[in-house]
């Protein structure tokens, strides 16, 4: 069974609740590396946990700024890249989170080296 959110199909392996979807047009892309694309949203300023969204090979995940998988899922190798990026770029992620909470434009964050 497929569900649709924002007019886009969601794969069977993804939980709909707790995972914010709608990647693409109008969604701030803050980084990309090794086929992984990282997004952050402005409309999540009421969420208590600083997090971002990762997309890779048709799979999506919400990941905390500390690199903990919150919802969804990625292949283990891609998740490892995301977690390494989060540990290296934690300060930049938190700065963007604060900018999002203030409804300010988000800044690009450098990819993995």
Residue positions per predicted region:
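Extreme N-terminal basic, low-complexity initiation segments
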Residues: 1-8
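Short acidic-hydrophobic surface loop/beta-edge motif
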Residues: 29-33, 54
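A short, structured beta-strand/loop element
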Residues: 41-78
């Amino acid at each position: 069974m497929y569900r649709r959110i924002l007019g886009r199909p969601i794969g069977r392996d993804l939980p709909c609740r707790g995972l914010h979807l709608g990647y693409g047009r109008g969604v701030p892309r803050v980084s990309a590396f090794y086929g992984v694309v990282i997004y952050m949203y402005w409309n999540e300023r009421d969420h208590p946990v600083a997090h971002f969204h990762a997309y890779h090979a048709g799979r999506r995940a919400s990941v905390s700024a500390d690199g903990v998988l919150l919802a969804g899922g990625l292949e283990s190798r891609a998740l490892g890249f995301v977690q390494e990026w989060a540990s290296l770029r934690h300060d930049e992620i938190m700065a963007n989170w604060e900018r999002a909470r203030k409804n300010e434009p988000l800044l690009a964050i450098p990819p993995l080296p």
